[in-house]
Design a protein with these regions (language model features):
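C-terminal reverse transcriptase regions that engage the nucleic-acid substrate
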Residues: 1-42, 177-179
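Short, conserved phosphate/pyrophosphate- and ester-handling motifs at nucleotide-, phospho-/glycolipid
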Residues: 3, 58, 135
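Active-site-proximal flexible loops/turns
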Residues: 10, 65-67, 142-144
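RNase H-like nuclease module associated with reverse transcription
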Residues: 16, 30, 44, 51-52, ...
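Structural motif corresponding to the C-terminal cap of alpha-helices
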Residues: 17, 35, 39-42, 63, ...
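Structured nucleic-acid-interacting core domains from mobile-element enzymes and related host factors
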Residues: 34-57
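Acidic, metal-ligating active-site segments
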Residues: 60, 64-80
């Protein structure tokens, strides 16, 4: 999938591949018409020399009406160039929007680690800490607060994973308003 603007739509439509209804086929044809009508659209890479990764993470809490599982979404920019993105249904049902957002943050953190490693292999130094942008103040508080409560016990592994990267100075969480 090389079109980030279609990532969420394709993720939703792929759930109905084995027994599609007419509405799913019509939606798929709309996607095909969109692609056919926009053949020149692509990713824009600038020649600037900034070596910073800027990841944004988000989730859609309980988005799947059948399972109530949330959808994780993220994108990562290197300078001004979009280099990675994902839209995927989470593996388990989240009991709160903060939990869904935090699972998205953990997934994005794993991607940051991988991308930093790839860039290092290419002899490209990345500025640290990476500024991880998130629209959930609750998820950010969970990430920076070393005290774990009953409400975070079931996402304990993700909490320690993200918190460890913060303490290592690899990432820093920043709030970005939902509207941006």
């Amino acid at each position: 999938m090389t079109s980030p603007d279609l990532a969420f739509t394709v993720q939703v439509l792929s759930q109905f591949m084995h027994s599609p209804k007419n509405s799913h086929m019509e939606a798929t044809l709309r996607v095909v018409r969109y692609i056919k009508g926009a053949p020149g659209l692509g990713l824009y890479m600038t020649a600037e020399s900034t070596n910073n990764l800027t990841p944004y993470c988000d989730s859609d809490w309980g988005a799947c009406l059948q399972t109530r599982r949330s959808v994780t979404g993220y994108l990562v920019k290197f300078g001004e160039a979009l280099i990675s993105w994902k839209s995927k249904k989470q593996d388990t049902v989240s009991r709160s929007s903060a939990e869904a957002e935090f699972r998205s943050m953990a997934s994005t953190t794993a991607e940051i680690i991988w991308l930093t490693g790839v860039l290092k292999e290419l002899d490209v130094e990345v500025q640290v800490p990476t500024q991880l942008m998130c629209d959930s103040k609750a998820a950010i508080q969970i990430a920076v607060n070393p005290i774990f409560h009953d409400i975070t016990k079931h996402i304990d592994i993700d909490c320690h994973f993200v918190r460890e990267r913060i303490l290592q100075g690899m990432i820093r969480t920043n709030h970005v308003p939902t509207k941006e």
